[in-house]
Amino acid sequence: MKLGFIGLGRMGAGMAARFCQANHDLTVFNRSAERLQPLITEGAKGAKNIAEVCAADVVFTMLSDDTSVEDVVLGPAGILANLKPGAIHVSCSTVSVSLSARLSQAHDQRQQGYIAAPVFGRPDAAAAGKLYMIAAGKQDLIEKVQPLFDVLGQRTFIVSDDPEKANLVKLSGNFLIATVIESLGEAMALVEKGGVNRHQFLDLLTSSLFSIPVYEKYGTMIADRHFEPAGFAAHLGQKDMKLVLAAAEELKVSLPFASILSDRFLDLAAHGGKNLDWSAIGSLAAKDAALIP
């Protein structure tokens, strides 16, 4: 089976490298060509354009937002125009529910397969093959690519036959993680203002009721006040909150916390923090409490 991979940012590069390490026949493409070389060194073939990647049987994409995905997939020289009938596009990007539905319909009209498979996990998990795959699409297509998911992740969750529902689940999960980050920041600011060491407080939390990776990883970043390099940049968190709110409006679901989080990301960006890790919103409560400048 020939594979293609488009989008070699920190997440995509780690995922593509996993396929190289598993000795798959892989062709890669990225708009910034300098990102190709590390994968070529690992055994991948570099493509000059999207059409060359689309000679593959399965093409993965890992792109940053709706605009990038629309350009790469629906553009005149994109995946839709070049993927052969029967081949499969697996989109691992975190995009809007509405765009995922459009992609599904567009691929269907061309007799091309489409699976939405956004992931939970940061770049270190991608490089280690420890992602959680959130997949939705036709059962026969998912069965065909499941061995590939096993290369990328420690577990695959199949949520629906409708691809866009995987994106709804992913966005809902990111909303929940952002809620945890903000809550951790607020709680740490409260105890610190009251004279309790924030690292000691975090150790108490993660050694008792909150011994889970989200609290441990992001809690440490907030307590250390160290948000670089960004595993997931704050401007992408802001983008995701907009997508969450758009999905909520479409489904007539009130999400007051999502509106607050959107404002927090906007506040962080206004103070020059859009490229910090998204956990930097957890520092805003300390700033509001005059604990840090």
Provide a role label for each language-model segment.
Residues 163-288:
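Helical "substrate-binding/catalytic lid" subdomain
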Residues 94-175:
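Rossmann-fold dinucleotide-binding core
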Residues 1-62, 87, 123, 155:
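NAD(P)+-binding Rossmann beta1-loop-alpha1 motif at the extreme N-terminus of oxidoreductases
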Residues 15-16, 103, 148, 190:
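Hydrophobic residues within alpha-helices
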Residues 50-113:
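Rossmann-fold NAD(P) dinucleotide-binding segment
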Residues 26, 46, 114-115, 156, ...:
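Hydrophobic beta-strand scaffold residues
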